[in-house]
Amino acid sequence: MLTQKTKDIVKATAPVLAEHGYDIIKCFYQRMFEAHPELKNVFNMAHQEQGQQQQALARAVYAYAENIEDPNSLMAVLKNIANKHASLGVKPEQYPIVGEHLLAAIKEVLGNAATDDIISAWAQAYGNLADVLMGMESELYERSAEQPGGWKGWRTFVIREKRPESDVITSFILEPADGGPVVNFEPGQYTSVAIDVPALGLQQIRQYSLSDMPNGRSYRISVKREGGGPQPPGYVSNLLHDHVNVGDQVKLAAPYGSFHIDVDAKTPIVLISGGVGLTPMVSMLKVALQAPPRQVVFVHGARNSAVHAMRDRLREAAKTYENLDLFVFYDQPLPEDVQGRDYDYPGLVDVKQIEKSILLPDADYYICGPIPFMRMQHDALKNLGIHEARIHYEVFGPDLFAE
C-alpha cells in the first residue's frame, strides 16, 4: 500500500518526467537491452526503431503518475496491458529487471534533480504497479491453461492452409502440431505468433486477430503485407507472406485480449473497420449472426476492391442475413469498381452518411484499423452523441491512440 507521501512525490514529479519522458525511456531501453539482450526477443524491435514504443511507454508512465490517487480509473488500460503481456509470455522475474533500469534511467537523465526521496517513491510506485499486473497476468495464464484445449506459454502449430484474401492480405489456417484441440476464444481476441527473423537474428512476436469463429480444432489469422510507406516493412508479417508455407511450423500463444463482444448479449453491435482492421470484426460478425441473432451493422473502408479482403463473403452474408446491414466505402476506387456492387460510398468512412442506420438503441460500437482512422471514427461517433462507454477499439503495437 502506497503512503500518501509517496503518492504526493510521484504526482509532483509527474510533469518533470513527462517533460523528459522520451529521453528517460530511450535511456531505459538502451540500458536494459545492453544488460539483457535476450529481452530483444520479447520487444517489438521495429517499434523500437521507429520510436513508437518509447512514446507509448513514456505516456503510460505519466498516466500512471497522474492517476496514482485513483488507480481504478486505469483498470481498463491495465487490463489491456496484462492481456498483451500474457500474449508475449512476460514472466514475473522480468519485472524487477524493468524496474531496475527504469529507475536508473530516471536518475541518469534527471541527474541531481532525482533525489533519493524521488527515486524511492518511484520505486515503490513501480513495485505496486508491477504487483497489480503480475496478479492479473497470473490469472490470465491459469485461466487459459485450465480450459479444454488451453495452454500456457508457447505451443507449436502447423500451417495447414495459406489463402490470399486480397492483393495485400493472406489468411493462414493453423492447427496444433500435437494434434490436440485448441481452446475457444472470445470473438475479437488475438493470438501471438513467435517466429525467428533472420534479418534481425532474433525471435520476434506479433499479435494477429483471430479472423474466424471458434471451432475447437484450428485458428485462422489474416495478415497484411507491410511496406511501401515511410516506415520499415513489417518483419514478421512479410516473413509470413514470403517465406512461411503450408507444412511449416510457428509458435502460438493462447488467445488473449479484452476487445471482444459479449456473446450472450442481444443488443445491437456496430462494427467499423479500416483495411486489415476487419479481421477481428469478421470473427465478431460470424458469432453475432448465430442464434440468438442480433442486429449487426458492418461498416468497412478500403482503398478499392484489390485490397478489400473477404469482400465476396461479406456481400453474400449481407444477402443471407436479414439482421446484417453492410456499408462499404472506397476512397480510391478502381475503374472497374462499381458503386452499388463493389462499394456503397466513395471516400473515407463517414458515419454521418449512414447516421440513421448506426444510431441504434443500446448499441455497442467497435472500431479497428489504422490509428488515424480510429481517431476519426471515435470522434465522429462522439459527435453523434454516442457515450464513451459504448465505444470500444483495438490497437496493435504501442497504444498511441489517445494523444
From Swiss-Prot:
It holds the Pfam family NAD_binding_1. The lineage of its organism: Bacteria, Pseudomonadati, Pseudomonadota, Betaproteobacteria, Burkholderiales. Is involved in NO detoxification in an aerobic process, termed nitric oxide dioxygenase (NOD) reaction that utilizes O(2) and NAD(P)H to convert NO to nitrate, which protects the bacterium from various noxious nitrogen compounds. Therefore, plays a central role in the inducible response to nitrosative stress. It is found in: Cytoplasm. Its EC number is 1.14.12.17. Monomer. This is Flavohemoprotein. Binds 1 FAD per subunit. It is an enzyme of class 1 (oxidoreductase). SUPFAM superfamilies: Ferredoxin reductase-like, C-terminal NADP-linked domain, Globin-like, Riboflavin synthase domain-like. Heme b binds at H85.
